[in-house]
Amino acid sequence: LYFLRNSRDIRGYGVEIDDSNVLACFNNGVNVIQSDLESGLQSFESDSFDYVVLSQTLQAVKHTEGIVKEMLRVSKEAIVSFPNFGYWKNRFQVMLGHMPVSETLPYQWFDTPNIHNCTLGDFEQFCCQHGARILERRIMSRSRQVTFLPNLFGMLAFYRFERQK
């Protein structure tokens, strides 16, 4: 939000529960509401924003369906990013009998906040089943866009989507 405000003159709000992160937002002049993300969007009216962005958090929320529904209620479009559990190195670690640990999944199985890992196919199926139309998809691996077998070679997924009309 700090970058968007300074580079694009965008007015935005963050939802953050951690005290130190809320303080950092205030110190940087970023608008923030201290709340749990699971209930933080409820305080906004429908269609309050052009976009809602959820960056590398979708896999860590308890109620994925509720969050996506709320994102699409309060905005025209939503943008999410998440680590691709289908990335080949993640698959290989599972094949060897271990939960994946990588740049995008940096936690051990016992201390991870990630409770809903998904692949590109899983997320796209979720969108179809929950009335979300995908507008754009970018799959990245080490700052490069992946177009060949993205579910296998992409580390990080970015999706822009809207409510079905």
Question: What role is predicted for each listed range?
Answer:
Residues D47-S48, V74:
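Alpha-helix C-terminal capping/helix-to-coil transition sites in glycosyltransferase folds
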Residues L4, M71-V74:
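Short, conserved loop/helix-junction motifs that constitute active-site signature segments
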Residues D50-H63:
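A short SAM/SAH-binding and catalytic strip from SAM-dependent methyltransferases
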Residues L1-G40:
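Class I SAM-dependent methyltransferase SAM/SAH-binding core
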Residues R11, S48-D50:
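Structural signature of beta-strand start/N-cap positions in the alpha/beta core
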Residues G40-S46:
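Short conserved loop adjoining the S-adenosyl-L-methionine
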Residues E65-E70, E77-K165:
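S-adenosyl-L-methionine-dependent methyltransferase catalytic module, highlighting the catalytic core
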